[in-house]
């Protein structure tokens, strides 16, 4: 990668950001690396980078058409995309529609419990602290975001959830929950950043009733369920088919 991307700006668990000739544009390379439990578990999922990049590009581009401002510019290779340079807000926004994962552990809710309304949560983006759950008052205390920005994040999160629930339902996939990140561009405008993929969403196959077979996301890696590549491939195929169908109707 170095001969093509001479200046690495940032490397995370799943992606690498490189500078481009335009200071307002970055190139994102999606890796095949897989991590779970705050990088305590590590592995490789063959082809994950290409699949996540393609899925994220399709979803971000579609969300743009629905009025959600994102950092996405274009997909340049199977595992690379150009994005607008943003300053990432140090908060992860999680939206939950069905109880799963940490929500079950922390509340005692049974996995699969349908929530009466979407639950929006905010986590501090800090690996050293274990990405702790934050109350709104703690967010204000830490001065991570302004009250106005917090209201915007909440609004965007719920709008994105409603849009993606409908989109995935047409793919015969249930959107259980998902994590998103936001950043601000040089004008201070908040943009949806990072990615939306099986790495950042819990997705259950509506055509499967078995609780293990229906899992189509990184829980297959977390829980050693196997067939990870096949699950990601299925998500990619259904997402691209749905995008193509929507484009044909436009």
From Swiss-Prot:
Amino-acid biosynthesis in keyword set: no
InterPro entries (alphabetical): SAICAR_synt/ADE2_N, SAICAR_synt_PurC, SAICAR_synth, SAICAR_synthetase, SAICAR_synthetase_CS
Catalytic activity of the protein: 5-amino-1-(5-phospho-D-ribosyl)imidazole-4-carboxylate + L-aspartate + ATP = (2S)-2-[5-amino-1-(5-phospho-beta-D-ribosyl)imidazole-4-carboxamido]succinate + ADP + phosphate + 2 H(+)
One Pfam family per UniProt: SAICAR_synt
MF-aspect GO terms: ATP binding; phosphoribosylaminoimidazolesuccinocarboxamide synthase activity
Keyword Nucleotide-binding: yes
Pathway connected to this protein: Purine metabolism; IMP biosynthesis via de novo pathway; 5-amino-1-(5-phospho-D-ribosyl)imidazole-4-carboxamide from 5-amino-1-(5-phospho-D-ribosyl)imidazole-4-carboxylate: step 1/2
Gene Ontology biological-process annotations: 'de novo' IMP biosynthetic process; cobalamin biosynthetic process
Keyword line: ATP-binding, Ligase, Nucleotide-binding, Purine biosynthesis
Record EC number: 6.3.2.6
Similarity remark: Belongs to the SAICAR synthetase family.
Record-linked PANTHER family: MULTIFUNCTIONAL PROTEIN ADE2, SI:DKEY-6E2.2
Protein name: Phosphoribosylaminoimidazole-succinocarboxamide synthase
